[in-house]
Design a protein with these regions (language model features):
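Glycine-rich flexible loops
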Residues: 1-171
């Protein structure tokens, strides 16, 4: 589906524009590699201090666009209260906001958060024991791996604290 989305290039800070371009490219790469899951996955990027100052703001995909449709100008800029900070015809994905605002709040040093449903990730998450230390590759990630039990679609703000607690300090 084609959308007539006007360019934001000349109306945002150059640092924001570059972040938008990079994040849109990331979305396209995730689509290319088959890591997206219709509209049920999301990627966000924290806006730099040069754009947001001391406010915590991030860019996230608009709800309803597939990853291969996302452009730099279609990304939605939000604050930590889910207020859209620019005029956009697209809503914010509620689950995307809950997950990403929780992660950006817990990890202010993280510039980008990717939530994907890769086949391998889904297969591991379906196993009661998760990743087992049965190969060199699996032991590489064990120390920085965290699990959060599925509670349904993450649309309630009260899930943020549990997500943050499960994330812990290792990630």
């Amino acid at each position: 589906m084609a959308f007539d989305i006007p360019s934001l290039k000349d109306s945002v800070h150059p640092d924001e524009w570059q972040l938008r371009v990079d994040l849109a490219a990331c979305y396209r790469l995730v689509a290319l590699y088959g890591w997206s899951d219709l509209v049920f996955t999301h990627i966000s990027a924290k806006l730099p201090h040069s754009v947001a100052g001391d406010d915590h703001q991030f860019l996230i995909n608009p709800y309803g666009l597939m990853f291969d449709e996302i452009t730099a100008s279609s990304l939605v800029k939000v604050d930590m209260a889910c207020n859209k900070l620019h005029d956009s015809p697209f809503p914010v994905n509620p689950a995307g906001f809950v997950i990403h605002s929780a992660m950006h709040e817990a990890r202010p040093d993280a510039g980008c958060v990717l939530h994907t449903h890769t086949r391998a990730g889904v297969a591991v998450s379906a196993q009661a024991h998760g990743v087992l230390p049965i190969s060199q590759q699996s032991t590489f990630v064990l120390a920085s791996l965290a699990y959060h039990g599925y509670e349904g679609v993450a649309i309630r703000d009260d899930e943020k604290t549990r997500l943050q607690a499960d994330l812990g300090q290792a990630n």
